[in-house]
Amino acid sequence: MKHILIVVDIQKDFVDGALGTAEAVAIVDNAAKKIREFDGDIFVTYDTHFENYMESAEGSKLPVPHCIKGTDGWTLNETVAQALADKKYTAVEKITFGSVELPKLIKEAVGDEDFDITLIGLCTDICVVSNALILKANFPEKEVYVDAACCAGVTVETHNAALATMKMCQINIEGE
């Protein structure tokens, strides 16, 4: 069986930059450990915006420029980048919360093999839940896991609400 790890948006702007939180900083070491110990295929998503972010639909609802491609805030958190340094992984740039490209890339990677998927990253209540639900919709017979110890939300309350939502959608929550 193949194992797939999705590292969702552990970028500088979400850890300790424009939209960073103490909770995000607190999960970095757990995420790096998970990456270092993982044996399988790794996909790393990058929230990717451009100079016109404030003119976008997202920018009108979240008026905080972040993850602008080419800026320091768009890059991976240094600890996570170091954990990935010796790993082969597929980078996936996405312009919105969930990646519609990710299921296609996973299908290509697994071929006919059985597989499961684990997600870690930021923010639990926006991009992690969006990608988890997209993956569960595309692979309804596969086990999808989220390691809560490697995730943080915008707030503790919304992190917990996202975990509850994912549980209701038959996504397995570990590390609570």
Which residue ranges define each predicted feature?
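Short, well-ordered secondary-structure micro-motifs
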Residues: 54-56, 102-104, 130-131, 157-158
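Histidine-anchored nucleotide/phosphate-binding helix
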Residues: 30-37, 129-139
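Active-site-proximal beta-strand/loop segments in catalytic clefts of secreted hydrolases
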Residues: 45-48, 95, 122, 149
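A short glycine-rich beta-strand->turn/loop micro-motif centered on a GG-aromatic cluster
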Residues: 118-125, 142-156, 176
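Internal catalytic-core helix/loop-beta-alpha segment
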Residues: 70-126
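Short phosphate-binding/catalytic loops that engage adenosine nucleotides
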Residues: 140-142, 171
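Active-site acidic carboxylates
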Residues: 1-90, 112, 145, 154, ...
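Short amphipathic alpha-helical segments
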Residues: 126-130, 134, 146, 161
